[in-house]
């Protein structure tokens, strides 16, 4: 199965294992809660999936790479205890609590989340001394003499033997006690994730043209050459930062992430062209509605991969504006909700307390900050959600400064000042939305003039549809031409599907 399907199965499993009956007991007893065993090549996204599932299910996550541990840290350290058995004093060996079990309790204490996921990675690559402990863990859900706490779902991951020389096969007794999921790389599924994760547009465009280079692991006389989904994502983060800093990524740098020489060389050449197209075609000018006439003449002679790269660059520019609009909208909505609570709280502040409104507002901000840090520690905030909260905190602290400088005479004056500050924020949101809409209209103007209803327009409209950022913007703000092209595209797909059905029907009847 692909990683998206695996994520859905894990999410459903967590919900099922943590479901309770009318008496408050777990509907599926712990003994029947089979651990999940994910088997797949390295760098496919198994660890990230666990973070997403924990966040979406609202539970804690404790993750360990078991190859980093010894038997002592997994089982605990031995110590001597005096016991009396049958009237005879004896010395017996007992063990301290496993570091892994202790970390679960520490996580529960730090996050106040009593249920969660224990994720053990590379479980089939452990040393010979630790292998029996891992079998006991999967079969009995214990480390040494300590059981995994109730309400914690066990998920383990490993690599097939063709990817790791240290792999140990599980026996049938162990496999009969787990739920095994075999995961394979899937570019279309990864691209869905990549769009939401804002993977660099050059990488998405390159993989659109060269899908065979998405994931490869090849062994030859020179060693193992590989490229993984993790490598592409990590490279994307670096490219974004390099662009911000005005630095250039060369082939040597790319080889550090894409450890497949031919693919690294190919992508490096493509990246150079990608930046060249951005400058030569003037993408920012296109999105400002000021495309140069020479651009259209050049496109008439350009090969398909160059035209597709330009479409990707235009989509990237739009995505940046859609993201800014979405972020401004999210910050404004959060601040509005915060002010509603502020209005209620101000009603309880006595008018005769000096600076009472500002102190109350300060305490509200402190509570919001503490809540943010608690959610962050628990892993319950996505990257976008955390960014929104941090921006909201920055806005609120600015408002607090204005409130203190104004030295408002009463609670009503204080709220009027805050309401005025919010109007400025709402204006900024409107400006971001208008800028994104104007760029979208300019993009359609260019696409119609340059490509009309060709394959490039199909790619453009399709990407606007499947990208979650652009889809959300279009749903909220609309665009007449997008809806028209999307409608025509759907009609074309339905017509093609109908023609295929008719052709298949004719073949079944011998062409009669």
How would you name each of these model-derived features?
Residues 2, 184-186, 243, 303-304, ...:
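Alpha-helix capping and helix-coil boundary motifs
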Residues 196-355, 359:
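Alpha-helical lid/collar subdomain of P-loop NTPases
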Residues 35-37, 57-68, 80, 89-116, ...:
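Conformational switch/transducer regions in large eukaryotic molecular machines and scaffolds
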Residues 1-212, 220:
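AAA+ P-loop NTPase catalytic core and its hallmark functional loops
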Residues 25-34, 43-46, 242-257, 512:
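Conserved, well-structured beta-alpha core segment at the onset of a catalytic domain
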Residues 300-512:
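Terminal-proximal interaction/regulatory segments of ATP-powered molecular machines
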């Amino acid at each position: 199965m692909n990683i998206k399907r695996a994520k859905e199965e894990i999410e459903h499993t967590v919900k099922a294992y943590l479901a309770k009956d009318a008496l408050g007991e777990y509907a599926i007893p712990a003994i029947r809660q089979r651990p999940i065993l994910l088997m797949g090549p390295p760098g496919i996204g198994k660890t990230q999936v666990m973070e997403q599932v924990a966040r979406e299910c609202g539970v804690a996550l404790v993750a360990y790479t078991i190859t980093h541990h010894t038997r002592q840290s997994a089982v605990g350290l031995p110590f001597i205890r005096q016991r009396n058995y049958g009237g005879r004093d004896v010395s017996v060996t007992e063990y301290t609590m496993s570091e892994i079990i202790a970390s679960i309790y520490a996580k529960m204490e730090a996050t106040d989340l009593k249920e969660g996921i224990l994720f053990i990675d590379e479980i089939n690559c452990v040393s010979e001394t630790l292998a029996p402990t891992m079998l006991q863990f999967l079969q009995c859900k214990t480390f040494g003499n300590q059981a995994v706490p109730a309400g914690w779902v066990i998920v383990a991951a490993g690599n097939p033997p063709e990817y790791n020389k240290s792999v140990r096969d599980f026996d049938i007794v162990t496999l009969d006690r787990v739920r095994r999921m075999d995961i394979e790389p899937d570019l279309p599924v990864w691209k869905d994730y990549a769009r939401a994760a804002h993977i660099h547009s050059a990488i998405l465009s390159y993989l659109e043209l060269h899908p065979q280079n998405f994931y490869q692991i090849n062994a030859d006389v020179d060693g193992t050459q590989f490229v993984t989904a993790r490598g592409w994502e990590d490279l994307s983060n670096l490219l974004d930062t390099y662009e911000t800093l005005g630095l250039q990524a060369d082939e040597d740098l790319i080889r550090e992430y894409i450890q497949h020489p031919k693919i690294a060389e190919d992508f490096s050449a493509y990246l150079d062209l990608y930046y060249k197209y951005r400058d030569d075609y003037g993408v920012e000018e296109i999105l400002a509605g000021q495309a140069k006439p020479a651009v259209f003449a050049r496109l008439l002679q350009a090969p398909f991969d160059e035209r597709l790269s330009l479409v990707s660059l235009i989509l990237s520019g739009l995505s940046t504006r859609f993201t800014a609009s979405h972020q401004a909208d999210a910050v404004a909505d959060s601040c509005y909700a915060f002010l509603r609570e502020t209005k209620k709280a101000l009603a309880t502040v006595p008018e005769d307390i000096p600076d009472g409104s500002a102190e109350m507002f300060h305490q509200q901000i402190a509570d919001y900050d503490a809540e943010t840090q608690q959610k962050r520690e628990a892993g319950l905030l996505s990257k976008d959600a955390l960014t929104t909260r941090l921006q909201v905190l920055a806005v609120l602290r600015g408002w607090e400064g204005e409130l203190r400088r104004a030295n408002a005479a009463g609670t009503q004056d204080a709220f009027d000042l805050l309401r005025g500050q919010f109007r400025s924020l709402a204006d900024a949101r409107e400006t971001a939305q208008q800028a994104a809409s104007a760029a979208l209209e300019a993009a359609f103007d260019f696409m119609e003039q340059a490509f009309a209803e060709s394959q490039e327009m199909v790619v453009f409209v399709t990407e606007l549809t499947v990208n979650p950022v652009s889809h959300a913007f279009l749903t909220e703000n609309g665009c007449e031409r997008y809806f028209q092209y999307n409608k025509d595209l759907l009609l074309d797909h339905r017509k093609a599907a109908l023609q295929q059905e008719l052709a298949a029907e004719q073949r079944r009847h011998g062409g009669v």
